[in-house]
């Protein structure tokens, strides 16, 4: 039967489209969609339940209620198909047409569409150049608008209220024309000549210089040109005909109680029809104007609430005071059409159950309950039963399954073999949250999960549930097996490290078996091979941890060598463990206590050296072995395992004495309360650390005599210590709370309580201590809940901005790249250069520092062997390709991306790197903190370091340094960005330090230094002013008690001058600026080198001068010191909020002020509360900026600054960095800042992922000069469009476009994407759709999201080939048929038009 119908069905070509075009629907188009006019507000007859004729559910308009049966029942059956019944007028056809046939309502008066009126910026308002308020007054019948002033002094589009209108009519009669309501607006829009208007705007643009005016004009210009180009007519923003949704999409369902459940839309439509009909009647009766006007206004309001309830005026509510859901509400938000039905659907063939551990499974297996499998694989079972002739029909097969016949279980066994299923655990934060396994049928009702897969799913067995999905088609099964099988996902896509790593019990077991124990049974025995060791161990002759000698196969570190037997000194456990090592892996990897890190390194090495298969087998074996020996170890935990250190009491007594001393000083008035607080906190946090250190020493080390009678130390076998040391569970910080002291606690406002909790959990807390600690515990729980939601939202925004970044080609051919060097924090190399460039492609060759030859050519993929060469070459910076500089237009190329982290080879075409990047950054989001850090105590003391002490031997290298030599012959730094690096003998950078202005260096550039040597010193508490030339000091504007204050130093008794702040000076001295000038022996001012400008040192408020007028000054002397306020420490935003701020490109509260041009600094006249800083460049350009007085400036009069240098401290704004220092610096800044946040939490993310997001944030450019293109100067455009246009212009020898990149936050960038479908499904649906339809946008369906929404394969992975094939076929067709036929296919699909030809806008 079905096949018959399918044959008759006309084949729908609507499926075959390549673009979607959205535009405004003209009244004629709306009528053409309609199957009839809805004239009555009635819905269905309450007795017969049949729809009323001409009503909202009318069968004549919308189609029959039952398949192939007219309403009155005259025609039934398929044979009458297509007949229109002459009694009831219903066409005999399928009832499903009631889901697609639309109706319409002819409105008695035009009505404005609220989206184009109220959605900001108001499109109608922009076109007419009126404010929204003015238009509303016209539309809602408060004012008249002058349409044609005629010969009167009235102006066009002037608004007149009732009285003014009457007055004008009395004065001028019918000379002028004024109207009100939507008719007036429609009339104006209809008679608008867009070409002339555009001409006018161009003329106005050339005439005006006002910024705001230009902005407004540009907006109007853009709107008008796009209206003109897209073929949308402005008057279509006013509705004459209202389309009616098909009735099955707004159903009316009778309930048992005789009441009806109805969609809100029906109520809204009824109001429109009622008011429309009433208005028609009033117009026929020629009712008084005021009544008609009121009715028209009510009709306008009814249509408004139907389209978007609540956007204007009161929200229309239903019977239960709940706002009615209008058409706009249907599509927006989480419950709207986009996010609820199009992007996420519920799927068939799925089930869910609790998970339990499956320690006997292999990595690619999962245990599936039989009952569940039976339900999931039903269709396959039916097929098997029928083909093997157990059953003749589907019905019979169904019966067999219901009766549980034995054949059914055989069938299940057969169909499940080699058929992978997919397991998913919510929340799916990254792609490893869904993996494929081969099912093993089990009894019971819980799914068994392999323990090693837990880390990827973030699953534990405390009641977690997982869902099972069955891939049905052959292709789906194939992809599940090759791409999603858990054994194919060993490495994490975020950082390329193994994610299949033993944890907890397994680690403990492996650690226990590889430890050494002195004096163990059988120590010193020798064995021929491992088998002999095994026999000896099983017979109880040797202990697991005994040190023995045994012959083992030996391989080189890199896996070469024959595996010759070598006598090795090791332990029994390690020898046994060596049995599971794959052939070719060196024994040295396990010849140590196997802590978690060591196990991870072993798996990583195995993967890199021997490949996937060996690694999977090794991981499984490690798991079985780990569980076995964890059981044998009998590790348990008891109160006696928590050893409280003996020294604790003594340490506490010492600290209490120190605190008493500080209290005493405070009481004597030597300390302020803030200083006291900081010092006390400092003491206690130090005490906590000391106790913890002593505790770990006592807990972790045991002294005993060995066989030779010597006293030796060995690690203890204390259970608690072993668990923490191996990395199985717990950390030093937690043990510290168990057996050390709990330490300092925070108050609810975040400040730290001065009295710490000195007890630990083993000793027990008293009531007060317990009460203090409750706050922290509760805050932790509240934080976690908030964090999850915030982290999820961040991931959603990231995915949305990067969803269409796909690898589309192999090589884009660019020669550009970014510079990468090691990451250094506080002098230590935190991330080595090798780690940062692993898996990248070189953009410039690497030159060997020792020989000067090319060590690695450009275009090399840096894998492990190449990294070894790189390290030998002794370079400390490398240029590599990056997605930031990739020249591919749509997507990125494989060479710029580099290695696919999850597979370990160059990335393949079709990989959705954007989504992977978003997931890698978003997934650890829940581990980040939510709160801002308060720096107190320990952190503060660390901040006041005043010297550089070297940790390694090497050669000192200075970079970015300006120095002068002082009278002692030492170098003094006079630059702010100076750095000191220590280079080792191989030419590698080992340490890097920033040197502040005024640091005194004890060494010269290139000098050899020894470990522990102090290279530079400075005073961390003051900021010096250093003389760069010599001369006699001469004071200007130094007036005691007016501009300066004299006091004597308490220690030395010398006179000290302090510059007074403006607020402390008398009014007469407000403009005086104290400065020190240097004079030569003739008494003339000394000028700075190469210029005529005298050297003046202006002194800011608070500066302290230790000189006298007329003192001799040498180069490098300190003229004055500016005290640093170290007490005022701001909180650093950390964790998630910081990451969100960076990705949203938010401007910091007090951004650093950067130099806009290169030149010389001078100070202009001060204004109230602000100082004026002027930079004069060499070519005569001048840049002025007003800076608040309280901002501390980094520069002095006469200093040279480079463009982009920091003038006043603060967090630099990313927009400034991009503008002044360029894209590379910006990328470096964002990557560095985000990595800092994640590194604090110990999360590793590859830089590439952050770069992908940055690339998306830089998608837009600002047009500076449009050249001979259709762009407008000052507008923002997509970079790819601009590049395309420039190619075209250059080919025609026309002027190209000049532009500069702009940075957009991720939310803004998602909404500004080329694809309106993707943007609408993200946020602000109404605004996006309104804008898109006015501009007549075309969605090319390039991204992933758009294709999911229209129900296609995504253009990534295996879907990329499908899309490229389609494109090629289409190009061929177009080539063969010419473009004549392609226009016929253009078919309007609602307002969303699916077009097959290239749009005119391309």
UniProtKB/Swiss-Prot annotation:
Binding site for Zn(2+) 1: 70, 72, 85, 88
Cofactor note as given: Binds 1 Mg(2+) ion per subunit.
Listed EC numbers: 2.7.7.6
Swiss-Prot/TrEMBL keywords: DNA-directed RNA polymerase, Magnesium, Metal-binding, Nucleotidyltransferase, Transcription, Transferase, Zinc
Gene Ontology CC annotation, any one: DNA-directed RNA polymerase complex
Keyword GTP-binding: no
Gene3D superfamilies according to UniProt: 1.10.132.30, 1.10.150.390, 1.10.1790.20, 1.10.40.90, 2.40.40.20, 2.40.50.100, RNA polymerase II, clamp domain, RNA polymerase Rpb1, domain 3
CDD domains: RNAP_beta'_C (cd02655), RNAP_beta'_N (cd01609)
SUPFAM superfamilies tied to this protein: beta and beta-prime subunits of DNA dependent RNA-polymerase
Reactions this protein catalyses: RNA(n) + a ribonucleoside 5'-triphosphate = RNA(n+1) + diphosphate
Positions of Mg(2+) binding: 460, 462, 464
A molecular function (GO) term: DNA binding
Cofactor(s) the protein requires to work: Mg(2+); Zn(2+)
Chain residues that bind Zn(2+) 2: 812, 886, 893, 896
Pfam family, one: RNA_pol_Rpb1_4
GO BP term, pick one: DNA-templated transcription
Signal peptide (from-to): none
Function: DNA-dependent RNA polymerase catalyzes the transcription of DNA into RNA using the four ribonucleoside triphosphates as substrates.
Name recorded for this polypeptide: DNA-directed RNA polymerase subunit beta'
